[in-house]
């Protein structure tokens, strides 16, 4: 049985956040308006999707984001509450595909799809550690 076999298609979840100045484009680029930033919206979509399926994954497993295809449709000011919804569209092969949306109480501000891959955390971290070692070795070769 694969880790994704227990993830039900159609299950959905939501997460709400109040937009703070730290979530705005202006926090990162002072000359820009203080509105909810696209990277932060995508982050909230990813977190909502990850938290939704975590309960269905075996112990020692997490999911990592592998594809994001999102449109940011409308600006949202500081103080507004953004609600993100993630819905499982498919759980096949080794990935889970989600429909994601964000609303600010007035407008739909974002929509798209997101794909996550469940991974066994121990194996994943070993691969990251091996890559870190290869990078360190490559850096040493460049210095000589």
State the predicted function of each range.
Residues 50-83:
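Hydrophobic beta-strand-centered segment that forms part of the acyl-chain substrate-binding groove
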Residues 8-14, 40, 67, 81-83, ...:
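Intrinsic-disorder/low-complexity, polar/charged segments enriched in Ser/Thr/Lys/Arg/Asp/Glu/Gln
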Residues 22-26, 30-34, 55, 62, ...:
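Flexible, active-site-adjacent loop/turn segments at secondary-structure boundaries
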Residues 78, 87-144:
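HotDog/MaoC-like acyl-thioester-processing domains
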Residues 16-20, 71, 113-117:
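Generic structural detector for well-ordered beta-strands
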Residues 2-37:
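Catalytic strand-loop segment that frames the active site of acyl-thioester-processing enzymes
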